[in-house]
């Protein structure tokens, strides 16, 4: 008889969209007083679900910008992420922050982080840092991301600005976060059909709508969809179950979504 652990370990899962932390200040879960999560809990929870690697950026739960020093705040988040990489090792893939008001600083930071093995930018969350995807300062940053082969994860916002950003930078790989409701999902699909450099991760709202994943795969293919949970905001067990237990998916489709696409985009080699 298969146990839960044996069953889950059959799958190699990479959670492309998380916001892990080493200190309570950076725990952005909504009900943290009832969870009291630690960095050890993150590792245990994910490993028990068959997740072999997590990806993503750090965010601050206390304030969007510490003391008004936007760039200082961003740099602190990036250094904390590198510290977390030293703690977790291969379990964690760093996601770094940039800011279009600080183009030179962002480009220099990308070079610094790239030399330390960082391949992921984002999740970009403009509302936390008071900009949007129409900001002209993003152009040089996103072009450099393409040159460096870095993947850009971005929070779903208004469709027109997402369209323009992705279309302006054809040599840069983008992964939109959150399918959301049907209207937004359909626009994600349209954007992905029009731009081969655009993918979608399944974190946040949307995956619980039965049939949305089948629609997404039929329209753009399982090779364009990545597993993500948005941990610790969302419960990763719900997302693991939504993929593994979905009888409308083939095993091959599950494999692409759960880890195959993340491995390919981030050039990850593991089991």
Spans of features found by a protein language model:
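Active-site gating/metal-coordination segments in enzymes
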Residues: 69-151, 207
């Amino acid at each position: 008889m298969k146990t839960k652990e044996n069953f889950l370990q059959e799958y190699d899962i990479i959670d492309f969209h998380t916001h892990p932390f080493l200190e309570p200040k950076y725990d952005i879960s909504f009900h943290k007083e009832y969870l009291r999560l630690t960095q050890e809990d993150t590792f245990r929870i994910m490993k028990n679900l068959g997740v072999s690697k997590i990806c993503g950026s750090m965010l601050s739960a206390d304030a969007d910008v510490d003391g008004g020093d936007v760039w200082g705040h961003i740099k602190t988040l990036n250094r904390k992420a590198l510290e977390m990489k030293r703690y977790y090792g291969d379990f964690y893939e760093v996601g770094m922050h940039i800011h279009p008001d600080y183009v030179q600083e962002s480009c220099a930071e990308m070079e610094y982080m790239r030399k330390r093995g960082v391949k992921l930018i984002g999740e970009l969350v403009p509302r936390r840092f008071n900009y949007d995807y129409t900001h002209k300062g993003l152009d040089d940053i996103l072009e450099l991301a393409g040159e460096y082969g870095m993947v850009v994860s971005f929070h779903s916002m208004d469709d027109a600005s997402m369209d323009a950003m992705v279309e302006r930078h054809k040599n840069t790989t983008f992964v939109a976060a959150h399918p959301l409701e049907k209207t937004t999902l359909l626009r994600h699909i349209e954007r992905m059909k029009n731009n081969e450099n655009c993918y979608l991760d399944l974190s946040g709202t949307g995956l619980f709508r039965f049939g949305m994943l089948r629609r997404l795969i039929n329209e753009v293919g399982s090779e364009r969809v990545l597993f993500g949970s948005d941990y610790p905001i969302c419960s990763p067990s719900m997302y693991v179950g939504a993929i593994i237990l979905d009888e409308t998916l083939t095993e091959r489709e599950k494999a692409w979504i759960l880890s195959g696409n993340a491995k390919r985009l981030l050039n990850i080699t593991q089991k």
